[in-house]
């Protein structure tokens, strides 16, 4: 980022005071002072956590030659502008643990020690059919992942040894500084090129022949994914600790996310199923029966009750024929049938009379001839209301576009006229 150097020098003695060393202290003096004070103030020994954090922050800055030079010249404010937080970006426990090897603690097995970072989870979509989540199924999936090298146990070297990177002092990060003029500089923090951000290097002759010093190798892994009855869309199935492995890292999880595909016949809403069925007007008035093939291939006989009339756009429900309830597979939701009644296009006069003879008479009184004479006669025609509304909306848009072309800048002309 770009920043202007402070107009006045800010505090450049605080970090030395925290460590209890003079500004002329050599790197070895800094190490000794930090180690002694950090052990004394370590939280696992009842020390002050804030003091422990301050010690780590001070040592991180002063042990890095480039950061120390900036601090001595401009003070802590310059570090905050260019590096964010005055160089306190590393975990104080990680800095402390670098003095005591991979165990990271001098206080025995009960000490907190070096905290491992957690690897990223790997998420995969898992497409399933409605039949899959109705009946339950198992899917075998082959995946590629990174695994710790078995030959060197993830060390990267034949001897198991590594060296602290001299380019970044083991931090894994470096800072590049560019000066553009008096008081103008650019400070960029980036992964160390020498160690690729690991903070350590391996001698070429000592590199593991299997992983070539990378510490991990690619491997194929087959997972059996158990899709249980009643699982929902977007529900997750987790395989803990099966993602990519890395040294000093808690392995992340592989997560499969259920993606339920659309079904041509059934629609699912939670634990219920919906199906559309069309019947004729005769069936709606006189009764119906039909066979419905369910998701498990069972044949269900669906029929109306004697004398029952089915109204258009009505619903009927069948209990315990919906989706199995997750982890309670012997309990199911409902199956809803949405009825559409198909009316005839027209009727002959004889059919009309026959129907009038059996259907209930109209409840409203007939219109008299005198009332008819006072009315204007109209003609009804068929219409698809959705298509009609779309056509009108399109016509309005075209009319608006034509008006804009005929009168460009119309609103501006009105404003000028008002002046």
From Swiss-Prot:
Topology relative to the membrane: Lipid-anchor
InterPro entries documented for this protein: DnaJ, DnaJ_C, DnaJ_domain, DnaJ_domain_CS, DNJA1/2-like, HSP40/DnaJ_pept-bd, HSP_DnaJ_Cys-rich_dom, HSP_DnaJ_Cys-rich_dom_sf
GO cellular component: membrane; plasmodesma; plastid
Cofactor note: Binds 2 Zn(2+) ions per monomer.
A single BP term in Gene Ontology: response to heat
CR-type zinc finger span: 136-220
Ranges for domain J: 14-75
Tissue specificity: Expressed in both etiolated and light-grown tissues.
Post-translational modification Cysteine methyl ester, affected residues: 416
CDD domains from the UniProt entry: DnaJ, DnaJ_C, DnaJ_zf
Subcellular location: Membrane
Residues binding Zn(2+) 2: 165, 168, 192, 195
Pfam family, one: DnaJ
Positions of the UniProt region annotated as Disordered: 378-419
GO MF annotation: an example: zinc ion binding
SMART domains attached to this UniProt entry: DnaJ
Chief location category: membrane
Biased amino acid composition, Basic and acidic residues: 378-391
PTM comment: Farnesylated.
The family this protein is said to belong to: Belongs to the DnaJ family. A/I subfamily.
Subunit composition and interactions: Homodimer.
Function per UniProt: Plays a continuous role in plant development probably in the structural organization of compartments.
Protein name: Chaperone protein dnaJ 2
Originating organism: Arabidopsis thaliana
